């Protein structure tokens, strides 16, 4: 990196840049913080040293105490070194602050430069016949002195501040407090950024970038024009705003190896846009159109490059996490599909369960026709009046005994639901259903009250095994009303036509030579008579007003 040529700029530029900055105050505050940190490190080191000395003095006995002291010794050394580094950093910052104060004191002020310019203008205005030649020469020599003084001051300040920053020590991370001979953890994840850097070094890309691309970036960054333009607020902006900077091995390794999460992604982008906002604010505050234009160009490239780099790192991390969780998530995703895989094995049982729906059809394939129940009830029709005498009771019991075969099939068959029995057609014959139900009730009551003979027990005992094999009969739902009570008859047909006078049998009505009107007149309403025995109800429908019933003619 070449140093800027301070002699190329007038002293007004150096004086304005040096006097318009924040001053040595922030550097002194930072130095004070480093001093405090150095003291804290030293106190912690003293406390740990006292603890280890107490352990060695006999607080603990055995090999464990020796292992404890050995494990804490590297950390104690790091505390001492960190304290020294913090103190050195504070000293370097104080040196830079002192250099700034010295440069500010040696720099010609803007007031001196302004007075020189004002005096030069007066001398030039009153230089009649060259009487002010010597004062003008002295004034110009004084301005040249201030020019050289400003350039020398800036060069000295740059040298001192650069040396102070370069000599500042860097503190290494604190070592782990582990056993001296403890093996390193094998479960630690490898540093992917370092792996990518090694791979880029192996294929030769790092050497190509350092020997070809990086010198070109340095040449563009160190142009005097850009250095003079951005040295006041962000001298690194020409480098960060160069697209070739994002092709560096470090940036590529960061994009492909850094474990980026959502929080880090937002934090990195927020920091970048904060810097960009500060650069834009400084550029617009300068009021220089060239500075504003170059700042907009460089900050745009910096924003686009940073977004692309961080987005690649985030997408790569999300893909790796998804692939790592995929083996654990597959069983959870396949759990809802497990019943579908077992469907062929249980299909037979599932379809067998649908056989119960066959009863809803009312016509089973193996069931006999539903005619026998009608024949069983038919003999009860000639006896419309039931008699309470006990004489018919034996006949009701002994009559079905000789032919026991026909009744069992209707009992074992599933009851039809669609109403194929006699009860559904009871409304066709008057009192048929009611007589059958009454006869059934009387017969049932007699059978319950009359003891059965011993001869009827043998067929029942013989039929017992068959009844055990047959399924249990489902009870027929009780009908609270007669069969015809469920039927509805519309006595009055509903038509959508308005009532009109019938033209049939009337012939052609109206005067001769007139056109016959095809559509008859609409009825206007009903005639209501005065109050009489019928209560003023309508008597005669209202006929068309042009219909003369006496002459059978119609005036149109």
From Swiss-Prot:
Entry keyword annotation includes Secreted: yes
GO CC annotation: cytosol; extracellular region; host cell cytoplasm; host cell nucleus; plasma membrane
Annotated motif Nuclear localization signal, positions: 473-481
Location(s) in or outside the cell: Secreted; Host cytoplasm; Host nucleus
InterPro entries cross-referenced by the UniProt entry: PPE-PPW_C, PPE_dom, PPE_sf
Biological function: Inhibits nitric oxide (NO) production in activated macrophages. Acts by inhibiting expression of the host inducible nitric oxide synthase (iNOS). PPE2 is translocated into the host macrophage nucleus, where it interacts with a GATA-binding site overlapping with the TATA box of NOS2 (iNOS) promoter, and strongly inhibits NOS2 gene transcription. Reduction in NO production in turn facilitates intracellular survival of the bacilli inside the macrophage.
Annotated protein name in UniProt: PPE family protein PPE2
Protein's gene: PPE2
């Amino acid at each position: 990196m070449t140093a800027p040529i301070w002699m190329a700029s007038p002293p007004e530029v150096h004086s304005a840049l040096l006097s318009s900055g924040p001053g040595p105050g922030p550097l002194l505050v930072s130095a004070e913080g480093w001093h405090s940190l150095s003291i804290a490190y030293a106190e912690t080191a003293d406390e740990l040293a006292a603890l280890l000395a107490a352990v060695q003095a006999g607080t603990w006995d055995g090999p464990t105490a020796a292992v404890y002291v050995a494990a804490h010794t590297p950390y104690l050394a790091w505390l001492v070194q960190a304290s020294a580094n913090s103190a050195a950093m504070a000293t370097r910052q104080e040196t830079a602050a002192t250099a700034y104060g010295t440069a500010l004191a040696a720099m010609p002020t803007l007031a001196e430069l302004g007075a020189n310019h004002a005096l030069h203008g007066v001398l030039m205005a009153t230089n009649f016949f060259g009487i002010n030649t010597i004062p003008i020469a002295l004034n110009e020599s004084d301005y040249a002195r201030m020019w050289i003084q400003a350039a020398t001051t800036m060069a000295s300040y740059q040298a001192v501040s650069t040396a102070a920053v370069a000599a500042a020590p860097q503190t290494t991370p604190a070592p782990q407090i582990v056993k001296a001979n403890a093996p390193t953890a094998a479960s630690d994840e490898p540093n992917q950024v370092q792996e990518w850097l090694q791979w880029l070094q192996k294929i030769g890309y790092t050497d190509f970038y350092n020997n070809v691309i990086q010198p070109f970036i340095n040449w563009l960054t160190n142009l005097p024009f850009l250095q003079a333009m951005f040295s006041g607020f962000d001298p690194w902006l020409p480098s960060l705003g160069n697209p070739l900077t994002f092709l560096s091995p470090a940036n590529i390794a960061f994009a492909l190896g850094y474990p980026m999460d959502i929080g880090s992604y937002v934090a990195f982008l927020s920091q970048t846009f904060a810097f960009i906002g500060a650069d834009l604010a400084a550029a617009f505050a300068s009021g220089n159109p060239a500075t504003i234009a170059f700042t907009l160009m460089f900050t745009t490239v910096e924003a686009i490059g940073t977004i692309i780099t961080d987005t690649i790192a985030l997408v790569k991390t999300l893909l790796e996490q998804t692939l790592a969780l995929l083996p654990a998530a597959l069983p959870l995703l396949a759990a809802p599909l497990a019943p579908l895989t077992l469907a062929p094995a249980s299909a037979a049982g599932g379809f067998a369960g649908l056989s119960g729906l066959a009863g809803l059809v009312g016509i089973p394939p193996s069931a006999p026709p539903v005619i026998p129940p009608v024949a069983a009830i038919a003999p009860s029709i000639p006896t419309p009046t039931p008699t309470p005498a006990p004489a018919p009771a034996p006949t009701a019991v002994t009559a079905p005994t000789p032919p026991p075969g026909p009744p069992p099939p209707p009992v074992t068959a599933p009851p039809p639901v669609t109403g194929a029995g006699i009860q559904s057609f009871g409304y066709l014959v008057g009192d048929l259903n009611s007589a059958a139900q009454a006869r059934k009730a009387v017969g049932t009551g007699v059978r319950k009250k009359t003891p059965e003979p011993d001869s009827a027990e043998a067929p029942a005992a013989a039929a017992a095994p068959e009844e055990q094999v047959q399924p249990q009969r489902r009870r027929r739902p009780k009908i609270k009303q007669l069969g015809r009570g469920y039927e509805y008859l519309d006595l009055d047909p509903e038509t959508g036509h308005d009532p009109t006078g019938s033209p049939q049998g009337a012939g052609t009505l109206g005067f001769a030579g007139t056109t016959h009107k095809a559509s008859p007149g609409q009825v206007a309403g009903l005639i209501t008579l005065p109050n009489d025995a019928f209560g003023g109800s309508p008597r005669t429908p209202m006929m068309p007003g042009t219909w003369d019933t006496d002459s059978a003619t119609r005036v149109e």
